[in-house]
């Protein structure tokens, strides 16, 4: 996850090599909850306001293929019917998962993707999207 901070005339996104001048930032930004910005040919669809009017968090979302695989693993681990609607926004708790189920889901993800998830990272996973984003980060770190 990248973070961004606002300066007097530009917004610098630390993990991307770009900066935006004030003219590129929509006026009244403090009232927005999220905004999409094209940066160096990439779109950051989840640029969200956090603390203060010009402080942001950029969420780079995982590939749809990864999200779909995570959905299938979650359905299998929770023994959900095949026609159950599970998507990136699905919270494990809303699907009926308790803490043991969540541990089993993480173990299934580790096996499926050939990764190892640290306990601290596993505890931060609340949704299918959280899991998919973490998987892509860990798989990317292995390369």
UniProtKB/Swiss-Prot annotation:
<feature type="modified residue" description="O-(pantetheine 4'-phosphoryl)serine">
    <location>
        <position position="99"/>
    </location>
</feature>
<keyword id="KW-0934">Plastid</keyword>
<dbReference type="InterPro" id="IPR003231">
    <property type="entry name" value="ACP"/>
</dbReference>
<dbReference type="InterPro" id="IPR009081">
    <property type="entry name" value="PP-bd_ACP"/>
</dbReference>
<keyword id="KW-0597">Phosphoprotein</keyword>
<keyword id="KW-0276">Fatty acid metabolism</keyword>
<dbReference type="InterPro" id="IPR006162">
    <property type="entry name" value="Ppantetheine_attach_site"/>
</dbReference>
<comment type="similarity">
    <text>Belongs to the acyl carrier protein (ACP) family.</text>
</comment>
<keyword id="KW-0150">Chloroplast</keyword>
<keyword id="KW-0444">Lipid biosynthesis</keyword>
<dbReference type="GO" id="GO:0009507">
    <property type="term" value="C:chloroplast"/>
</dbReference>
<feature type="domain" description="Carrier">
    <location>
        <begin position="64"/>
        <end position="139"/>
    </location>
</feature>
<keyword id="KW-0809">Transit peptide</keyword>
<feature type="transit peptide" description="Chloroplast">
    <location>
        <begin position="1"/>
        <end position="60"/>
    </location>
</feature>
<dbReference type="InterPro" id="IPR036736">
    <property type="entry name" value="ACP-like_sf"/>
</dbReference>
<comment type="function">
    <text>Carrier of the growing fatty acid chain in fatty acid biosynthesis.</text>
</comment>
<dbReference type="GO" id="GO:0000036">
    <property type="term" value="F:acyl carrier activity"/>
</dbReference>
<keyword id="KW-0275">Fatty acid biosynthesis</keyword>
<dbReference type="Pfam" id="PF00550">
    <property type="entry name" value="PP-binding"/>
</dbReference>
<dbReference type="InterPro" id="IPR044813">
    <property type="entry name" value="ACP_chloroplastic"/>
</dbReference>
<protein>
    <recommendedName>
        <fullName>Acyl carrier protein 3, chloroplastic</fullName>
    </recommendedName>
</protein>
<comment type="pathway">
    <text>Lipid metabolism; fatty acid biosynthesis.</text>
</comment>
<keyword id="KW-0443">Lipid metabolism</keyword>
<keyword id="KW-0596">Phosphopantetheine</keyword>
């Amino acid at each position: 996850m990248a973070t961004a901070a606002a300066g007097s005339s530009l917004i610098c996104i630390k993990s991307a090599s770009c900066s935006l001048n004030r003219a590129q930032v929509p006026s009244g930004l403090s009232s927005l909850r999220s905004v999409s910005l094209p940066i160096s040919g990439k779109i950051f669809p989840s640029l969200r306001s956090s603390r203060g009017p010009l402080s942001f968090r950029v969420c780079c979302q995982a590939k749809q293929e990864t999200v779909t695989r995570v959905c299938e693993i979650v359905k299998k681990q929770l023994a959900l019917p095949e026609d159950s609607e599970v998507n990136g926004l699905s919270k494990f708790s809303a699907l009926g998962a308790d803490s043991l189920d969540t541990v089993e889901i993480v173990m299934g993800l580790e096996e499926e993707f050939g990764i190892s998830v640290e306990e601290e990272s596993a505890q931060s996973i609340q949704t299918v999207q959280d899991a998919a984003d973490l998987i892509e980060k860990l798989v990317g770190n292995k390369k």
